[in-house]
Regions:
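A conserved hydrophobic helix/loop-capping motif in glycosyltransferases and polysaccharide synthases
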Residues: 2-14, 18, 25, 35
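Conserved short acidic donor-positioning loop in nucleotide-sugar-dependent glycosyltransferases
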Residues: 10, 22, 37-39, 62, ...
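Acidic donor-binding segment of Leloir-type glycosyltransferases
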Residues: 19-57
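Glycine-rich, basic loop-to-helix element that forms the pyrophosphate-binding segment
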Residues: 58-75
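Short aromatic/hydrophobic "clamp" motif used to bind/position activated sugar donors
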Residues: 80
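Conserved donor NDP-sugar-binding/catalytic core segment of glycosyltransferases
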Residues: 88, 92-108
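Positively charged, low-complexity/disordered segments
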Residues: 109-113
Length: 113
């Protein structure tokens, strides 16, 4: 249902904690697309998770906005969520959003900050 887009630049140490926090979601109706924006030390995901994780590495630094766009173009799901590498979702965010979408079948865009 969701692809969570995570831009990251020179903060690979944030990624394990971010992914671990997503294991606390009350549903796993999502995958994660991490866009490594040409960090000095590349982002690597070596652990398995109960959701798919894809890492894309930019060959040149593109900035956070373009990295989000790259993530969106490489997303596999219909709904996109954006999460910075040093931020965390509430544990029930994906479930609550799925419930809202199910209740409002014609919804095409939701935003929460």
């Amino acid at each position: 249902m969701f692809s969570i887009i995570v831009p990251s630049y020179n903060r690979k140490e944030e990624i394990p904690a971010l992914l671990e926090s997503l294991t606390k979601q009350t549903t796993y109706n999502f995958d994660v697309v991490i866009v490594d924006d040409c960090s000095k030390e590349p982002v690597e995901v070596t652990q398995s998770y109960p959701f798919a994780v894809k890492v894309i590495r930019n060959e040149t630094n593109q900035g956070a906005a373009e990295s989000r766009n790259i993530g969106a173009r490489n997303a596999d799901n219909e709904w996109l969520l954006f999460l910075d590498d040093d931020d965390r979702f509430a544990n029930d965010k994906c479930q609550k959003l799925a419930d809202v979408i199910a209740d409002r079948k014609s919804t095409r865009l939701n935003s929460s900050h």
